[in-house]
């Protein structure tokens, strides 16, 4: 039988748009794994996804599994027959399981003994008989956080299922998936094309759906069309569309037949901060904002309809009518909020709980104010501006605008601060206090903003760890991992002279007696060092490089960064492997030794030429390295230390460290200890693999 194209389509009610791509990709990956596990040869597995369907198309699927030779070893001959040569129950049970008698079994003889053996030629199963079960298994493994039941069925899925189509070439595969019998019926667009029609062959998909059903099943093709049409629509009105990938993905998942249209709103709304308008357009309505070449918001937006209308202006007008009240709300909130100064909202912060054991948002504000001032003093920022920014940092949370449009927190604080006449770096700090919000996000731009951002995040870390609510597994309700990484990124990338030890101690001190975890400082630092590990692994540094630095537990992030980069460079040197091995050997020798070492090497006790040479090199190097260590020039220091390869190799080749003479032995151990201490000034390179 020849290989054929296999198609499966699961027709559903509207699937969650933000999960659609992940569902489709997982379906394809799961089914591919099932095919491989079943030893069914196949070509490319393509996935399709639209709001009301998930589908897979497999090229060149084998009609059956290959035949195979089956061997099952039974009991040893000694256990298969008793002393009289009669078959035992063990042998009979094994033979019965194989579908034969003991007499029909073969013998397997090796140098370890002799066993009963069943050998047979197993014919591969037909793909038809396997596919429905494999599809069901693949679907059962989809990442669905919440399943639904529908009708009177016991079956559960992410959304109710109405059709299942499984075709191998032009042959319908019988069977049930999710309680639905396989059929040739496909459902088209809700309002265009044919509501239902039949498909004759798997090779007709997805073209038949496009032509008869008016559904673009190819997700990436649909996304590309939306992107291209939106860019062209923006160009026609002299602008550039904000086609953020997350919104583009969501819109792609909402439509089956994308039609891109352009609409407008009243120019008077442009007096409202653009962030509030964009929040409404993107977040609520799934519209694409349009900007001019200078980055200013235009009074237009682009949206995607799910239907091709004879009167597109009617659809455009409808969307304009929908968005106008939301923009009017934003205008009203903006004008109303500006009747009060930001600081007038401070008393209301006392009515909002930050965390039951840690007090109100006003309590948090007071701590942030003090900590931001402290951080500013450490990094050379304006202390007065930092403390002022700390005082105002949460006031915008009490405004009408932020209450209604929550994602505008921070940015509205900036606009209101400017209206109140606050210093510009105070206003900017209010906007940037939450940065970085996600991996790759921009950092705060000014020193005052950095001080506020660090203070806000460290207050949360100290408080939540201080009451023992550490992140567990995937659960991190206070986003502590993001907060820790944000602090580290700011300190490292801005090269700030902050130490996690003193920073955490200050954050903890400001809580007074509220915290119950006596180990809170150490817990926070260990947690942050753990985030360092994850960050640098993502950056491409090897695990053992990071472990080598973590062994020294450096608590200044900028210093940690310099050490990691130095060790990564050291690994590229020819001497690295030998010196890492030597350090490991030295570490083991010193760990096993019970001798008390001297404070310094006694040159008069040195006997062998190799130990004298090594000691001389260490003296010379120590003078060179002292200023390098002091200035954090670790890469240069390790390059200098790489010159020790030959004297270290010679020492281990020619010198007996554990000499019988105690004075000689202790002197040599002291020499090795000093060698290791020089490397440990940077990292523990003995852990390098």
Curated annotation (Swiss-Prot):
The keyword Protein biosynthesis applies. It catalyses: tRNA(Gly) + glycine + ATP = glycyl-tRNA(Gly) + AMP + diphosphate. One of its GO terms (molecular function) is arginine-tRNA ligase activity. Pfam families: DALR_1 (PF05746), tRNA_synt_2f (PF02092). GO terms for biological process: arginyl-tRNA aminoacylation; glycyl-tRNA aminoacylation. SUPFAM superfamilies: HD-domain/PDEase-like. Keywords: Aminoacyl-tRNA synthetase, ATP-binding, Cytoplasm, Ligase, Nucleotide-binding, Protein biosynthesis. One of its GO terms (cellular component) is cytosol. Tetramer of two alpha and two beta subunits. It comes from Pectobacterium carotovorum subsp. carotovorum (strain PC1). PROSITE patterns: AA_TRNA_LIGASE_II_GLYAB. It comes from the Bacteria. This is Glycine--tRNA ligase beta subunit. Its EC number is 6.1.1.14. It is found in: Cytoplasm. Belongs to the class-II aminoacyl-tRNA synthetase family.
